[in-house]
């Protein structure tokens, strides 16, 4: 949700923590919020690769370094495992967002970096590396091997849609629903939840029984 500076002040927080983009416009926003509220504003890099350092930095600020060190090590193990896995994966993928499935993240965006980390090649190129709308015609030309989505409405209708059914991913039953409870595992929000999503993707793409993944979910939470 969005809070005004007045509401933030009324809550009397000791610290504002913002994990996400650290581009100049977000830095300026953090500075403005600090000036307006007088509350220290901690802006941390939300990229998946920065997760271990982000956790350690949070530990220092919150006085729980022992806990966040364990979490940071888990993150490092997850990232290394994904990089090793990516060396043997040669498939293209498309992340379908929204009920229509035509919103997605461009290659290198914070929304698709989890699937790209394990070696899936994002079919959507772009300069600003953010969210974008695509057309069905473009998608048919790209013809991804795999489609990933965490939108249940879209997942339920894609197989019966005559346009989408032309895609190889649909024909070959390579359309996968991303778990989204309590948060999306690969996106929405693009945060710590993606560590579990990265491990889930490796399990999925290795064609292992999904029931065998339950212990990892319990360990993560």
Kindly give the residue locations of the regions a language model identified:
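Extracytoplasmic substrate-binding proteins
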Residues: 26-103, 124-126, 133, 179-221
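Active-site/pore-lining binding-face segments in mid-to-C-terminal subdomains
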Residues: 145, 152-199, 203-204
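Short, conserved, surface-exposed binding loops centered on an aromatic residue
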Residues: 84-87, 104, 114, 137-141, ...
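Alpha-helical, coiled-coil/dimerization segments enriched in small aliphatic residues
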Residues: 104-130
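Acidic/His-rich segments in extracytoplasmic proteins that coordinate ligands and/or metal ions
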Residues: 1-61, 132-169
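Short, composition-biased local secondary-structure segments
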Residues: 1-9, 78-85, 105-107
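Histidine- and/or cysteine-centered catalytic micro-motif in compact active-site loops
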Residues: 98-99, 120, 127-128, 144-145, ...
């Amino acid at each position: 949700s969005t809070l005004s500076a007045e509401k933030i002040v009324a809550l009397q927080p000791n610290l504002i923590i913002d994990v996400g983009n650290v581009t100049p416009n977000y830095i300026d926003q953090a500075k403005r919020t600090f000036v307006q509220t007088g509350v220290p504003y901690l802006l941390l890099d939300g990229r998946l690769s920065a997760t271990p350092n982000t956790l350690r930095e949070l530990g220092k600020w919150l006085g729980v370094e022992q806990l966040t060190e364990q979490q940071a090590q888990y993150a490092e193990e997850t990232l290394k495992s994904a990089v090793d896995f990516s060396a043997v994966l040669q498939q293209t993928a498309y992340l379908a967002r929204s009920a229509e499935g035509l919103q997605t993240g461009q290659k290198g965006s914070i929304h698709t970096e989890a699937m790209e980390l394990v070696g899936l090649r994002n079919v959507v190129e772009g300069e600003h590396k953010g969210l974008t709308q695509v057309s069905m015609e473009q998608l048919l030309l790209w013809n991804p091997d795999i489609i990933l989505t965490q939108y249940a409405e879209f997942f339920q209708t894609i197989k019966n849609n005559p346009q989408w059914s032309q895609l190889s991913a649909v024909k070959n039953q390579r359309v996968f629903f991303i778990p989204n409870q309590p948060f999306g595992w690969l996106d929405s929000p693009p945060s710590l939840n993606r560590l579990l999503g990265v491990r889930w993707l490796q399990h999925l793409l290795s064609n292992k029984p999904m029931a065998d993944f339950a212990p990892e979910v319990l360990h993560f939470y």
